Amino acid sequence: MGRFAPSPTGRMHLGNIFTALLAWLSVRSQGGSMLLRIEDLDPQRSRAAYAEQLRRDLSWLGLDWDGEMPPQSTRSPVYASHFAKLEEQGLIYPCYCSRSELHDASAPHASDGTVLYSGACRDLTPEQRAAKTRRPAWRVRVPDIAVSFRDGVCGPQTERLAETCGDFIVRRSDGVYAYQLAVVCDDALGGVTEVVRGSDLLGSTARQLWLFSVFGYPAPQYYHVPLLVAPDGRRLSKRERDLDMEALRARCTPEQLVGRLAQLAGLQPGPEPVRAADLVSRFSWERIPRGEIVIPANFSDGFRVFP
């Protein structure tokens, strides 16, 4: 069981499409099923209109799915029950540190690029907590253990949680449950056995595997695919409109776009137009590049331009 898990914060860009294509091809090449899950945890940036557009864009590309999980914004009771399980085990504590205090600490960075938490609030007494006036976020105590796993693209990985992850937030100060908790609950309860996502999320994997073990769930197999970068080395973002789905759909057919992505993925030697379904028999993880993939400056040359 695989999954698409897009965030409805804008139109998909080329990197999102590339990852979605590989996730779909991997599952379909094994005769597996695909779930769609809308990750709308961020209430400030998520829009229902974007979620509907994501569905249309995936369908336009020929990437179908077999079922859809309820959006994350509707699943707070599920996350609350898992939060309570952590609390019952004494793994949760309130953190009153502001964002500026965390950054002013000049602490080393965690494996996901965030500031490694210093543990300032880890052992506060009940009296010290009662004296705080700020609404707390909630962190989980991580053990000083090594978590090892084999990524399907990046190979063997080992992280020592206390050194590369630190106590991480599972519920924000505004009450919203954090991504790390939500994604583990949803993957486990959705029966997901294979997670394909960008290599920028590799640093989140060890802590998620640890949460799977704490909750007693089997963990999925992970594949962290290379990022697509602009010719000047910049990472793509949804703010760059020239390579998002709105611009691409106005300039090309689904087969043209899939063909160019298949070439970048090593699934065909040239950019010939092809349907996603026709790539299933060619798919192999052995063919996927291991490092960042630079999008050629002439990537869209030859696309059919619609009047």
Roles of regions detected by a PLM:
Residues 1-110, 199-200, 204-217, 274:
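N-terminal Rossmann-like or analogous alpha/beta NTP/dinucleotide-binding catalytic cores
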Residues 1-9, 29, 34, 129-131, ...:
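Non-catalytic terminal extensions that flank enzyme cores
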Residues 13, 75-81, 140, 180-181, ...:
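Noncatalytic linker/hinge segments flanking ATPase motor cores
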Residues 30-31, 62-66, 98, 167-169, ...:
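Short, surface-exposed, polar/charged, turn-prone segments marking secondary-structure boundaries
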Residues 64, 92-93, 111-112, 254, ...:
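A general structural signal for well-ordered secondary-structure junctions
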Residues 78, 101, 116, 256-257, ...:
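Exposed alpha-helical structural elements
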Residues 86, 113-115, 261:
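Short alpha-helix boundary/capping motifs
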Residues 100-237, 244-248, 297-307:
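Active-site cores that bind ATP or allylic diphosphates and position pyrophosphate for catalysis
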